[in-house]
Amino acid sequence: MVRPGALAFNRRTAQIATMCELLGMNCNVPTDIRFSFSGLIQRGGRTGPHRDGWGIAFYEGRGCRTFHDPLPGCESKIAELVRTHTVKSLNVICHIRKATNGRVCLENTHPFTRELWGRSWAFAHNGRLKGVKDWPLRFYRPIGTTDSEHAFCWILDQIRRRHPTPPKKDMAVLRLVRKLAAKLNACGTSNMMLCDSRYLYCHCSTELSWLTRRAPFGEAHLIDTELTVDFAKETTPRDIVTVIATRPLTHHEPWQVMERGRVVVFRNGLQVGA
């Protein structure tokens, strides 16, 4: 259990240290992201300094719907649209930006998306990667100027080089992603989320926490805004929902701090390939 006092202290200190913040969700049934999104978006200029844009990618079947805005999340009409309309998905990646590499503009907002093997892949990153923009690319090119997007293109390049077609065993991709994440981590800070519509890959370089909600469900209270949800009224007993965030979003829930240097993968709301 995370102590509320510790969360308040971490929130103040992280405003200085954290360059961006990430939010991911992976579930076994389509689940509404609005509660967690409502907490994260407050950190986009109101309770946090991440005013340089925001974005969300969520899957609907094999398709991936994205919204981006270079405006602060707490002021964005598009963010308000997402926050007030039902958004249910098995996999979601959100990002609020504190620009450190690349100017503030639409093309530099995360998550980034590309196609591989006929699937939409989404990626968001927190940190700085020294020298990564010098790494050669073959199949993919950045649209913007961030080191994050270059790293994403490089990851997919490496996966495509090793596996031109989908490997028979999904764990082959997991093993490769772990190696690629370690190489990126050697260049600086690489907290990242990567999704192929089925698996959500999360790498912790400095700071990520995660929480799995399942029956019996209870109430949850956001840290950054006055909002409470009783999940017992919003779910069924079979629902399994895992939320991953740079910093915990709620009080009095058993958030787990992810081990630094580790890639944790989720499918259907559960950790796989541990």
Indicate where each model-derived feature is located.
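Catalytic core of PPM/PP2C metal-dependent serine/threonine phosphatase domains
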Residues: 166-206
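Cytosolic regulatory regions built on CNB/CRP/Popeye-like sensor folds
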Residues: 61-65, 119-120, 131-140, 198
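Glycine-rich phosphate-binding loop plus the immediately following alpha-helix
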Residues: 132, 138-162
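A conserved acidic, glycine/proline-rich C-terminal tail/linker
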Residues: 219-262
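Extreme N-terminus nucleophile/cap motif
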Residues: 12-77, 220, 261-263, 269-274
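Short acidic (Asp/Glu) patches
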Residues: 70-82, 96-118, 135-138
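Gly/Ser/Thr-rich active-site loops/lids in small-molecule metabolic enzymes
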Residues: 144-147, 205-229
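Conserved beta-strand-loop-short alpha-helix elements that form
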Residues: 20, 121-131
